[in-house]
Amino acid sequence: MTSLSRPRVEFISTILQTVLNLGLLCLGLILVVFLGKETVHLADVLFAPEQASKYELVEGLVVYFLYFEFIALIVKYFQSGFHFPLRYFVYIGITAIVRLIIVDHKSPLDVLIYSAAILLLVITLWLCNSKRLKRE
């Protein structure tokens, strides 16, 4: 196998980085549209008189924060020189598990396992923010 010349490798890297950036830009725009739709849905649920709408409102709020966190992750990617900070993924994981507990809380054992997963993610977040591992 022949090795590629340095300019050719940099050209391929630039092309792939551009494709990745365009893809993330499109994903960010799609998430903004979904965030707008979720805002309208939350407004509808807020004024619904049913008791079940309260659970739907809480679930909708957590989904709203998930959209918001993904958009913030994409913004941070562009601001930090095309790098995804690990702690943002941990935040998203914690929020997603909280949503899962809210939606599916029938089995106490499952809730306990989900809570242990949140504890593990919080410990991970603490380690990521420690002085030894902090990069930003």
From Swiss-Prot:
Residue spans crossing the bilayer: 15-35, 55-75, 82-102, 108-128
Membrane topology qualifier: Multi-pass membrane protein
Pfam (any one): PsiE
Similarity-based family: Belongs to the PsiE family.
HAMAP family (alphabetical): PsiE (MF_01048)
PANTHER family hit by this protein: PROTEIN PSIE
Stated name of the protein: Protein PsiE
Originating organism: Escherichia coli O1:K1 / APEC
Lineage: Bacteria, Pseudomonadati, Pseudomonadota, Gammaproteobacteria, Enterobacterales
